[in-house]
From Swiss-Prot:
GO terms for biological process: manchette assembly; spermatogenesis. It is found in: Cytoplasm. Its main location: cytoplasm. Changing residue 82 to S: Found in non-obstructive azoospermia in one patient; uncertain significance. The gene is AXDND1. Highly expressed in testis. Highly expressed in the round and late spermatids. The lineage of its organism: Eukaryota, Metazoa, Chordata, Craniata, Vertebrata. It comes from Homo sapiens. May be essential for spermiogenesis and male fertility probably by regulating the manchette dynamics, spermatid head shaping and sperm flagellum assembly. This is Axonemal dynein light chain domain-containing protein 1.
Length: 1012
């Protein structure tokens, strides 16, 4: 087997190999080598024979080869493994292998020579693993003691010996003590048998020499001794020059050097001994092994000892640190104690000062307390005095009020002022109903405002949710468009940079076609978002938002309708709401445009998809490399067109076309939300102000009505003057009376207008609210559902009756008919009831002319009555009288057989001088009198029948109650009987089941007996 030469270390001649060996320093094995030999190397010419004296000074060739073969070993050629049947060429090795190594049996005897080779990697068997202190960058740092089997070597860095450390990751999270360190150590050499030779390699696949088995001379032993002395001397000089960071560094440095030298000398000595006697060499090798093991044990003991030493040193260092920290803490505490003492002294002074101030304040407080007690006594005395005065005043007021009340009753009875009482009751009823409806209106406004805030908040949440959905859809669409655009730009650049018509573009265009189809699929999905179910769901959400907005807008309109001004004008918040609704409609319009794609998406996306489809079709039908350049230009134009479309779509994302006058969504939406918030605040203020204003107007009307009634009573009661009173005073009192009546009339007209306006306004505000409440109560089958509606009518009736009573009183005082409200106003106030109320006034107006004509007849009759009163009456018969209720609700009396009022009409009718219209009126009146008598008779008969029917109904109700009680008792008894029967049936069934079980058990017991 031929061995090729290694390129790094050619070994084709003996001279070159020797020169290489002399150049190699022994430091690779841990020493500096022999300086004398290095100096003499350049002076000797190996080509010539040397004298014997000079030859004795050189190391023998075999010794030098055995010492330096490890350093000069070259890598083993790969063609040697596995071995081939080729002869090894000459000149590959420095010398021939001895014959003893070619025989496996004999080679095993000398195996100890190759089991312990010399190592240059620092894996020698020394005690350098004790080295635990590193010295890096001028700092000494202790390391954990490593076990001996790791066999860490020592390396020299700038004169400082540091342990070899394997490469580790600097950014690792694993602590250093858990890192795995691998070291191959010193392994034995391996032999490979060839057909023509035997090779020796180490663990690094380097080709080594077998130890020489030639006989040795005494000169070689002497020269080996000189080499050892020289190497030890050189090592001692280096050790003196070396200064490590610690003593352990220096000790380990010496041990490393010496052990390396001893290892080399031992190896050569064992070889020399083995040449003469193999057994003696083997024994010496065993002694060497034992020696190494002994050193290893000593090293282990030193490790334990050194661990204890290092631990104690660390503990001492920690104790020193703790002592230093303790001392530092004591200093800090002492300093703080001084500060606390100073602060304590300061606080003591401040406390003494505060104590003095407090004592002075206590003295002042005692003085002030005495003064306060005196003031309190004065206050109690004054309060008792005032309470006594108040009691006296209250007693006097009660006496005068009771006397005034009794006098008022007597005056009312004497002067028949019954209508004043009805005026007071009407005012009281009107005030009660007005307060009730103001409170009801305030509660309804509060509920509507709370509901309005809730609905607007829900509407805002839905709008924000819709905005997020639309923005997410637009963002995903824009990202997709960016991906498509980037892909188009990438492929277009690729096509423009390289030759697209080359024959090796087939695979590339397949990937392009896949990308185009994928983009087409994605864009179709985005197109479906603007049509179909997605669009319908967005429209449904928008419809819900619109419906919710209409609801809170209707509630706002209801509030505004209840809070109109007295003139019927809507509040300013109504216009503000209309402005909000206009902006909301703009927002809806913009959302619709963005949802359905009218901003350009729905038009550009289909054209973009068709362009992609066209490009895909072209790429599928292209034939390489025979495709004409025109088709590629057409595809390139389509790509440019698609890029422009994509740019337009990306610019349209989140906006609408410029020709539509719509603001940005975010700005417009924030503006609308702010307007709604301000609108709600304004509505709350309007509600509070409106209710306060209603209450204020009611109080003013209440006081004005009472004041007018008091003034009326004062004027209605006549002034009684003495006979001795002067005429001037009577004239002055009559003038004052006329002025008071005129002022009372003016006040009544003004008060009537205000009362009519306020009552109409309040009833119009509450009408819709009360109707809705009545409907909701009726649907829930609530009792008295229409009670509030009746109270609204009662409010209007009380207002009308007060005004009507006021007009009656003024008419009686003035002596002529006074109307405070027109027919249209009454119709607006009472609606359908005004016609019934105005039947009698219309009839009175039709007979005004008749009354004027009959005034003269009445005057004549009065004159006749006065004459009759002047003449003494001789008749003892009493005149029969009839009592009737007048318009003022007072009881009046008149003679039963009064002179006929229509006698003048009848006389003139007999004479034929009466006009035709009066004849018709007389006929109508007589007919009406007859009908009235008939109606009165029927009414009396109906009343009698009603009383009889009512008594019968009362008796039947009593009988029904008795019958119901009997029915209830009978039902209870029947239920109890049914329950008893059910219990009996259940018991009977249980007894029957028990009997059947007993019978079945007896039958089962009899059946086995029959079997026997």
């Amino acid at each position: 087997m031929s061995l090729p030469k290694t390129p790094s270390t050619p070994l084709n001649s003996t001279s070159t190999s020797e020169s290489k060996k002399l150049k190699v320093s022994v430091a690779k094995e841990g020493t500096r080598g022999l300086p004398e030999l290095k100096e003499k190397k350049n002076m000797v010419d190996r080509s010539k024979l040397l004298p014997t004296s000079l030859q004795n000074e050189f190391i023998p060739k075999e010794v030098l080869l055995s010492l330096t073969y490890a350093a000069n070993a070259g890598p083993c050629p790969e063609n040697l493994l596995p071995p081939k049947k080729i002869k090894t060429p000459k000149g590959t090795l420095p010398r021939l292998v001895d014959h003893v190594w070619h025989h496996p049996v004999r080679r095993n005897k000398f195996k100890y020579l190759i089991d312990h080779p010399v190592s240059l990697t620092g894996a020698g068997r020394d005690i350098s693993f004790l080295y635990d202190v590193t010295y890096a960058k001028g700092q000494t740092r202790e390391k954990a003691v490593c076990p001996p089997h790791l066999a860490r070597s020592l390396q020299s860095h700038d004169g400082v010996i540091v342990p070899h450390k394997p490469k580790t990751l600097t950014d690792t999270l694993i602590p250093e003590e858990f890192h795995i360190v691998s070291s191959t150590g010193v392994s034995g050499l391996e032999c490979y048998d060839d057909k023509y030779t035997t090779l020796l390699t180490d663990s690094e696949n380097r080709l080594l020499l077998f130890p020489s088995m030639k006989p040795n001379k005494r000169v070689e032993v002497a020269q080996l001794n000189d080499v050892m002395d020289t190497m030890l001397e050189r090592a001692g000089v280096e050790n003196q020059e070396y200064t490590g960071p610690t003593k352990m560094h220096k000790l380990l440095h010496i041990l490393k050097k010496e052990q390396t030298i001893y290892n080399m000398i031992f190896h050569e000595l064992i070889r020399q001994v083995s040449v003469d006697c193999a057994d003696r060499g083997e024994l010496l090798s065993k002694v060497r092994e034992r020696y190494v093991q002994m050193l290893d044990q000593i090293a282990r003991q030193m490790i334990d000892f050194y661990k204890d030493l290092v631990t104690q040193r660390v503990m001492d260092q920690r104790i020193l640190e703790e002592l230093y920290n303790f001392k530092h803490v004591i200093e800090e505490l002492t300093r703080e104690l001084c500060l606390v003492r100073a602060h304590d002294v300061k606080l003591t002074k401040e406390t003494e000062k505060a104590h003095k101030d407090l004592a002075q304040a206590l003295l002042n407080a005692e003085k002030n307390a005495k003064i306060v007690e005196e003031y309190h006594d004065l206050y109690t005395l004054q309060r008792e005095r005032m309470e006594n005065d108040m009691k006296k005043l209250v007693a006097e007021r009660d006496i005068w009020s009771s006397a005034t009340y009794e006098l008022a009753l007597k005056v009312i009875e004497r002067n028949r002022v019954i209508l004043a009482r009805r005026l007071y009751l009407n005012e009281k009823g009107w005030n009660k109903y007005t307060k009730h409806f103001i409170i009801l209106l305030s509660n309804k406004d509060t509920e509507d405002l709370a509901l309005l805030q809730k609905l607007t908040q829900k509407w805002r949440n839905l709008v924000n949710k819709l905005k997020q959905e639309v923005e997410q859809m637009e963002e995903s669409t824009s990202e997709t468009l960016k991906i498509v655009k980037d892909g188009l730009i990438k492929w277009q650049e690729f096509f423009n940079e390289k030759d697209i018509l080359s024959p090796n573009k087939g695979n590339i265009f397949n990937s392009v076609l896949l990308d185009f189809k994928q983009w087409q699929k994605i864009l179709n999905e985005k197109k479906e978002e603007f049509t179909g179910d997605v669009l319908l769901s967005k429209y449904d959400t928008l419809k819900i938002i619109k419906h919710l907005q209409e609801n809170w807008a209707d509630i706002g309109l209801g509030i505004f309708n209840r809070h109109k001004s007295l003139e019927g004008e809507m509040p300013s918040e109504r216009q503000y709401m209309e402005e909000i609704i206009k902006n909301i409609q703009k927002l809806y319009k913009e959302y619709e445009i963005r949802i359905n794609g009218d901003n350009g998406y729905s038009k550009i996306l289909p054209s973009l998809i068709s362009s992609l489809d066209f490009c895909s079709f072209k790429l599928e039908n292209l034939e390489f490399p025979d495709t004409p350049l025109e088709e590629w230009q057409e595809i390139d134009e389509k790509i440019n067109e698609m890029k422009s479309h994509l740019d337009i779509l990306l610019n349209l994302t989140g906006i609408v076309p410029q020709h539509i006058d719509v603001d940005s969504v975010s700005v417009l939406q924030a503006y609308i939300f702010n307007m709604i918030q301000q609108w709600l605040l304004k509505i709350g203020n309007e509600i509070n102000n409106g209710n306060i204003e209603l209450q204020h107007h009611m109080d003013e009307l209440h006081i004005s009505m009472i004041q007018w009634m008091v003034n009326l009573l004062i004027l209605m009661i006549p002034n009684f003057t003495d006979q001795d009173c002067l005429l001037k005073l009577e004239e002055e009192s009559a003038e004052k009376h006329d002025i008071g009546v005129a002022r009372l009339e003016l006040d009544a007209i003004e008060l009537t207008r205000k009362l009519y306006q306020y009552s109409s306004y309040l009833s119009s505000c509450c009408k819709g609210m009360v109707t809705a409440m009545a409907l909701s109560k009726s649907t829930n089958s609530h009792k008295n559902a229409t009670e509030d509606l009746y109270e609204v009518d009662k409010l209007k009736k009380e207002c009308y009756e007060w005004i009507n009573t006021c007009s009656c009183l003024l008419s009686n005082i003035k002596g002529r008919k006074i109307t405070l409200l027109t027919y249209e106003e009454i119709e607006r106030l009472l609606e359908e009831e005004a016609v019934k109320e105005f039947i009698e006034p219309e009839i009175d107006e039709s007979f005004k002319e008749d009354e004027e004509e009959s005034k003269e007849d009445r005057k004549l009759q009065e004159e006749n009555k006065e004459r009759a009163e002047e003449q003494p009456s001789t008749s003892t018969e009493k005149e029969k009288l009839i009592r009737f209720i007048g318009e003022d609700e007072n009881v009046h009396s008149k003679p039963l057989f009064e002179t006929d009022v229509l006698s003048s009409w009848r006389e003139s009718a007999k004479q034929g001088t009466l006009a035709q219209k009066y004849l018709e009126a007389m006929a109508v009146i007589e007919h009406m009198q007859e009908k009235l008598l008939e109606v009165e008779n029927r009414a009396r008969q109906a009343e009698e029948k009603f009383e009889d029917a009512y008594e019968k109904l009362h008796h039947t109700l009593i009988k029904n109650k008795d019958l119901e009680e009997l029915v209830m008792t009978s039902r209870k008894e029947s239920k109890e009987e049914k329950e008893n029967q059910d219990e009996r049936e259940v018991k009977e069934e249980e007894e029957q089941q028990e009997e059947e079980e007993v019978r079945s058990a007896e039958n089962s017991s009899k059946s086995p007996k029959k079997g026997h």
